[in-house]
């Protein structure tokens, strides 16, 4: 059985139960707030919420960010199954997960992403589900970069034509002409600086704004190739 599609809580290796505490706080936020957009995911979107670019683009959009640093596909899936999207009715769910599934194949991870999409759809039948591409990682070209690119390719194929599911490439400008990634864009060659966040958030903001502002966006949006 593919472990990426089996809902699993993050192991409490430190023994302080922080992950479960964060999850419960997110559930509480759902009861108290009425977001238009919910972000679900991992370290990439957990860290960008502290950048100037996030405050510029997404703070005004009535967003909740339910991203947790070490999450893999199976951990986000567990959170969805255990209340992360209960008592809330956002117009859009942005799902970014998979880059931490380093021990799984690209195909397994893509199936894990699809399992999350399916579960989100069960919880929120009419919400738009937006899937930003996984980013390249590592200062120089490496196998994890290649795998993330393959995951993006497989996810595009698995989700093409699904109701109100949209993929969006957000990696433009991160890899330089010599194949390297600058620490000015990714401070640890995985997570983003403010400059890097601006590069990935602009195309995402454009898509979310279109969905939120159009009366009938499903007539204007076509699934990404």
From Swiss-Prot:
CDD domains tied to this protein: PAF_acetylesterase_like (cd01820)
UniProt cross-references to Pfam families, sorted A to Z: Lipase_GDSL_2
Entry's family note: Belongs to the 'GDSL' lipolytic enzyme family. Platelet-activating factor acetylhydrolase IB beta/gamma subunits subfamily.
Official protein name in the record: Platelet-activating factor acetylhydrolase IB subunit beta homolog
Coiled-coil region(s): none
Superkingdom per UniProt: Eukaryota
Quaternary data: Does not interact with Lis-1.
